[in-house]
């Protein structure tokens, strides 16, 4: 085996020395990315403009929010100037796609979790952003806009996984984010893991509540607070 390896090494050395690997042609080539791929963290949320599917928004765990107007061929970061780079949810107001809501703080309670700073809103397709409150929720997993009344927005805040956290649950605004009301709260150990709206009845909501706690050395999932909740009157 050793003899074979030595022979192959000698052969490759002689072969490479015999070749004329000119790098002159590289002078005419523009700089380019040959890998590895740039990382923006885990993708946590995607939304698409229904009337123009080429416009896509992608939220990431630690790399902010990205926008494509070319159906995904090219991407631009549009959230870099904000206080947090962790996005848990992005929602487009389909009746006016220039209005974008972003819930910050990744909703997946990993040990490498990044915290957020509430919910943000853009009225110009992501060119500028305004903080709309809920800064203490830490981690938002879902934002839902009522298609029949875009001033009504729901937020599922899973909250911090590291301990008791009262700023979690389901929140609702009926005035475009000027004020918020907590409409579902179980206990300080239980956050809103997800929220869905009936597409035929915006007053019907289903919320998945999850009791959990993460520590550096273990993860506790489940408890008395966990369960599925339904509302037929908008919370």
Task: Give the predicted meaning of each segment.
Residues 1-21:
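Bacterial Sec-dependent N-terminal signal peptides
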